[in-house]
Amino acid sequence: MKIDILDKGFVELVDVMGNDLSAVRAARVSFDMGLKDEERDRHLIEYLMKHGHETPFEHIVFTFHVKAPIFVARQWFRHRIASYNELSGRYSKLSYEFYIPSPERLEGYKTTIPPEQVTEKISEIVDKAYRTYLELIESGVPREVARIVLPLNLYTRFFWTVNARSLMNFLNLRADSHAQWEIQQYALAIARIFKEKCPWTFEAFLKYAYKGDILKEVQV
């Protein structure tokens, strides 16, 4: 499952281990019990979520491939209960792929120049920075040094492996109007995938544990 985001980004589900029933099994092992019928299994997930018994959800694990601007990735990497591997600008020549916000992104802000000019200025700086990057590489400057001229709207790619408990914490903080708009879009994509793979857990999360303010308003 792959969801396109922003102008060139995406979130792609690479792998998932477990589902709603994984949390049920993990919770019932305390009583040396397993699965029961669907109604009682689903009720248990709601009970766990309502009362803050979160460790059973750590047995559901997702791996995502994410393409995002560097400034989004740096916010993402603050979520430390996860595993990350990122594209290296030291070992790879970086492509001309930059996030350019549309003029609509700036609607509602009191800028002293038109939004269209903001977009043009960002594009001009990006062009100059990338030309400089290529010139440095062609001059024999190592990639690890040449890359420092590139701005934060450069796209990077990374793998993110995270359990469902930590994923829900990510959604609490990033699927929220206080988060930057760009990372909100990625959080909405993560929520869509989470909902598809773990519908009972997602529903219980929204009902009892979600602290943000956009998932309930947006169809995910």
UniProtKB/Swiss-Prot annotation:
Cofactor note: Binds 4 FAD per tetramer. Each FAD binding site is formed by three monomers.
Motif segment (ThyX motif): 78-88
Binding residues annotated for dUMP, in chain numbering: 75-78, 86-90, 147, 174
Cofactor needs: FAD
Catalytic residues in the record: 174
InterPro entries: Thymidylate_synthase_ThyX, Thymidylate_synthase_ThyX_sf
Binding residue positions for FAD: 55, 78-80, 86, 163-165, 169
Protein name: Flavin-dependent thymidylate synthase
Gene: thyX
